[in-house]
A protein has these predicted regions:
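Solvent-exposed, well-ordered loop and adjacent helix/strand elements within mature globular domains
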Residues: 24-169
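Gram-positive cell-envelope targeting signals
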Residues: 1-28
């Protein structure tokens, strides 16, 4: 699906925002994503260079986990568009169409000038950008430019929704 078609479908979609409580009592909001959004790119954690930023401080706490993805408290470090969240350190869950829930934390934000008009998708159609150590990055993901190709298969397919928690790491 082309980015133009995705953007048109975004305009046609009415965002469903529901407040919920998870098993631990933490509240979250479920945010709708454009239909068919499946591209999950990556960026090097070394691209975060402002030593005074919270993003930089979070990366000092992060470790490189499985597939080369940076993690904090067992959550993958990601960047998403401002529609979903802007507070660095916020806990997020990426809910896949196949039912897989990927626990994440907002470790960097996508600049609005690099997203579509709704601030949901990157200009390249990316829904989520994983923050990685490129030296440890899964080889297939590196070749394809998409984290959907991690060997576990847990990131394959379209994203159904994004849960934004009312708590940070």
């Amino acid at each position: 699906m082309s980015v133009k078609k995705i953007i048109k479908s975004v305009v046609a979609i009415t965002a469903v925002v529901v407040s919920c409580l998870n098993a631990y009592g933490a509240s979250y909001t479920t945010k709708a994503v454009p239909v068919g959004a499946s591209k999950k790119t990556y960026m090097s954690y070394k691209a975060i260079t402002d030593r005074t930023s919270y993003q930089y401080k979070l990366q000092k706490r992060a470790t490189t986990g499985k597939y080369g993805i940076r993690t904090i408290d067992g959550r993958y470090c990601i960047a998403v568009g401002s529609y979903y969240c802007t507070t660095i350190g916020t806990k997020l869950d990426i809910v896949m169409e196949n039912g897989t829930v990927v626990k994440c934390v907002l470790a960097d934000g996508k600049d609005n000038k690099h997203t579509d008009s709704s601030n949901r998708l990157g200009r390249n159609g990316c829904i989520v950008e994983f923050i990685v150590d490129t030296k440890s990055l899964d080889k297939t993901c590196k070749k394809m430019g998409d984290m959907s190709y991690v060997s576990s298969g847990g990131l394959k397919g379209a994203v159904k929704s994004i849960r934004v928690y009312d708590e940070t790491v």
